[in-house]
Amino acid sequence: YNLIEQIAVIADGKKFVSALIVPNFEMLSQALKDLNIKYKNTADLIKHSQVIEYIGKQLQKFQKDLPDYEQIKKFTLLPSAFTIERNEITPSLKLRRKVIYANYSREIEAMYK
């Protein structure tokens, strides 16, 4: 899915599925050209309501064939990728979920409030 660079899906022990999403900022800025959104940096861009809405609609299209209980209900956009340096991914680019959950615990908790 070319709008998403990285995604960490959160579901274990939760009432619904959520996700931390790192957009593919190059593809996103191409897709949003028509919306004429002004932003300084990626942190600024991901807070924009039109960006969140756009990614949400794309996510819905992508998940349409999944059973309801498997669909991502809420998501948080992140301004930068998960990295090996922060120990969030392995050298083979697998997600280290425990580290990601710890590093983004505030963002995760906010999705379940």
Regions found by a protein language model. Give the residues of each.
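AMP-binding adenylation
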Residues: 1-113
